[in-house]
UniProtKB/Swiss-Prot annotation:
GO terms for biological process: DNA-templated transcription initiation. Keywords: Cytoplasm, DNA-binding, Sigma factor, Transcription, Transcription regulation. Sigma factors are initiation factors that promote the attachment of RNA polymerase to specific initiation sites and are then released. This sigma factor is the primary sigma factor during exponential growth. Gene3D superfamilies: RNA Polymerase Primary Sigma Factor (1.10.601.10), Sigma-70 factor, region 1.1 (1.10.220.120), Winged helix-like DNA-binding domain superfamily/Winged helix DNA-binding domain (1.10.10.10). GO terms for cellular component: cytoplasm. PANTHER family: RNA POLYMERASE SIGMA FACTOR RPO, RNA POLYMERASE SIGMA FACTOR RPOD. This is RNA polymerase sigma factor RpoD. PROSITE patterns: SIGMA70_1, SIGMA70_2. Residues 194-226 are annotated as: Disordered. Residues 196-218 have a biased composition (Acidic residues). Residues 558-611 are annotated as: Sigma-70 factor domain-4. It holds the Pfam family Sigma70_r3.
Length: 625
């Protein structure tokens, strides 16, 4: 494909040059220069339109001289621009081959990925701020939802009891972050500060320690537990005050609204971890779904069962979700559906009472809950869109890292998929204030996701990650010792080098062996498989099988030389061609004689078989082990 494209461009360049020179082209000439696999009429029309846009007319047949003279009279006087012809040829070739490149999923992925521009440091910061704004809007919405505060306080109580870590509840303080941002902005607006030569020298000397300082800053120290305890205590006090005011005045009183705002002001100063935020969002969404469930049931009863027009229902229902007199008010209108509505009155009131109970349980009106849900959804959508942009702009980074892990048991597309999962985790945890680029931070998450997936999925029998790391270390040291001594290292030498017990080294070496498929091709022609060369101990060997068949045939031939009675007695006594052998008593009953007589017949038959003329045929089988 790569070798064909330059040739196609050259042919199309000549075609365009010819068209510019003579002022026209025929459909036959254009068709001769198009790829054979291009059959889409729309693409062919696009190519014709592009040629027409260059000032070249396309005709069914070549026009005569008079027609050309009537069309601007410039036949043969067009200047052929080689650069324009090359650009047009490249564009047409790209268009021609577009259809042939859409069947391969890898090519499609790469092409779509390449359409997204790379981000600069400023672009990364801008997107990170949008993500932060979206999450802040989500937390602001959760802050005015009282049950979110209740869950947060319950989790903090679990932390005090030792059931949860503090990092699972609070990871920082939003107000302190905003103050630091404001201070940094003021410092940047003030311009560069003049420093003395001595200070400049000191800064140069400290450059070597910048990396260590950055690493130290990047280390998660966590919020101050004392400060967290103080804010949690204040939040608990505000929550108790809110519940007291609510119990006295109801949800819509201005004192209740003020108490809820005071509670939300403290709630939003706490920076919550993503898992806890997701749990709070799920809780609010569950409440909203419960409200919608009640409303859907009322809608079904009123419009489907009672046949109330949907427009009438929506117009009268809005604002009356918890008004238990709504059905009576609707019945007073005395419409043709009134009788059916009266039949479902009790069911509708039951659903309304369910909505009222939800209002009481959540300390909010239905309208307030829906408004909070809308604000939360808006923030989620904003953060989700920004995260999507950040991920799409860094997909190339995943490709470059995944290439280093090919041929390790996973397909390339699987490696890309796992790397993309790591990239999305990096987007969730990226903190632009620390000063490093996103790619620097994301590389670690992508690499970890890929290596973990290889450890979990590449082997037929899964090995724990810590054992995979030990195996990799063992293999690395084995290669080093092979290069050093020119021979394979012994388990004793490896145990000494790795500072591990020798029996554990042998165990790791045994675990490191990978299973191999029995369908693995063997030989240059690959017409046989490994399983063909493995002995099946459950099946009789061909030699033993052949020997047994020959022995059976020989025994039958020898017995044929005896009398029928003697042959049958021996067959029954030794179980020849029978399921089991028989006792003298059983054989005697068969022949209606005594057991002594059967013993005599058996002894006589065996004496006959010992004769050299007969025994020689059987003696050869005794030599076979």
């Amino acid at each position: 494909m790569a070798n064909e494209r330059p040739a196609q461009q050259s042919d199309i360049k000549l075609l365009i040059s010819k068209g510019l020179e003579q002022g026209y082209l025929t459909y036959a000439e254009v068709n001769d220069h198009l790829p054979d696999d291009l059959v889409d009429p729309e693409q062919i029309e696009d190519i014709i339109s592009m040629i027409n846009g260059m000032g070249i007319d396309v005709h069914e047949v070549a026009p005569d001289a008079e027609t050309l003279l009537l069309n601007d009279g410039n036949t043969g006087n067009r200047e052929v621009d080689d650069t324009a012809a090359e650009e047009a040829a490249a564009a047409l070739t790209a268009l021609d081959t577009e259809g042939g490149r859409t069947t391969d999923p890898v090519r499609m992925y790469m092409r779509e990925m390449g359409t997204v521009e790379l981000l600069t440091r400023e672009g990364e910061i801008a997107i990170a701020k949008r993500i932060e704004e979206g999450l802040s809007q989500v937390q602001a919405a959760l802050g005015v939802f009282p049950l979110s505060t209740e869950m947060l306080l319950a989790d903090y109580e679990a932390h005090k009891e030792g059931k949860k870590r503090l990092a699972e509840i609070v990871v920082g303080f939003n107000d302190l972050i905003e103050e630091a941002d404001a201070a940094a902005a003021a410092l940047a607006a003030a311009g560069p500060v003049a420093v003395s030569d001595d200070e400049a020298v000191d800064e140069d000397d400290d450059e070597d320690g910048d990396d260590e300082a950055a690493e130290e800053e990047a280390g998660p120290t966590g919020p101050d537990p004392v400060e967290v305890a103080t804010r949690m205590e204040n939040l608990a006090n505000e929550y108790a005050k809110f519940k007291k005011v609510y119990a006295k005045n109801g949800a819509e009183h201005k004192l209740v609204v003020k108490a809820r705002e005071d509670m939300a002001a403290i709630f939003t100063t706490l920076k919550l971890p993503l898992p806890l935020t997701d749990a709070l969002v799920t809780q609010l969404r569950g409440v909203v779904n419960g409200i919608k469930d009640h409303e859907r049931k009322v809608l079904h009863l009123a419009t489907t069962v009672a046949r109330m027009p949907r427009k009438d229902f929506i117009r009268s229902w809005e604002g009356n979700q918890t008004n238990l007199e709504w059905v009576e008010d609707a019945l007073k209108r005395k419409q043709k559906w009134s009788s059916a509505l009266r039949d479902v009155k009790d069911q509708i009131i039951s659903e309304q009472q369910g909505s009222i109970e939800m209002e009481k349980a959540n300390y909010l009106t239905l309208g307030e809950i829906k408004e909070i849900s809308r604000a939360m959804a808006y923030g989620e959508a904003k953060a989700r869109k920004a995260k999507k942009e950040m991920v799409e702009a860094n997909l190339r980074l995943v490709i470059s890292i995944a290439k280093k892990y090919t041929n390790r048991g996973l397909q390339f597309l699987d490696l890309i998929q796992e790397g993309n999962i790591g990239l999305m985790k990096a987007v969730d945890k990226f903190e632009y204030r620390r000063g490093y680029k996103f790619s620097t931070y994301a590389t670690w998450w992508i690499r970890q996701a890929i290596t973990r997936s290889i450890a979990d999925q590449a082997r037929t029998i899964r090995i724990p990650v810590h054992m995979i790391e030990t195996i990799n270390k063992l293999n690395r040291i084995s290669r080093q010792m092979l290069q050093q001594f020119g021979r394979e290292a012994t388990p004793e030498e490896l145990a000494k080098e790795m500072d591990m017990p020798e029996d554990k080294i042998r165990k790791v070496m045994k675990i490191a062996k990978e299973p191999i498929s029995m369908e693995t091709p063997i030989g240059d022609d690959e017409d046989s498989h490994l399983g063909d060369f493995i002995e099946d101990t459950n099946v009789e060997s061909p030699i033993d099988n052949t020997t047994n068949i020959n022995l059976s045939e020989t025994v039958r031939d020898v017995l044929a030389g005896l009398t029928p009675r003697e042959a049958k007695v021996l067959r029954m006594r030794f179980g020849i061609d029978m399921n089991t052998d028989h006792t003298l008593e059983e054989v005697g009953k068969q022949f209606d004689v005594t057991r002594e007589r059967i013993r005599q017949i058996e002894a006589k038959a065996l004496r006959k078989l010992r004769h050299p003329s007969r025994s020689e045929q059987l003696r050869s089988f005794l030599d076979i082990d």
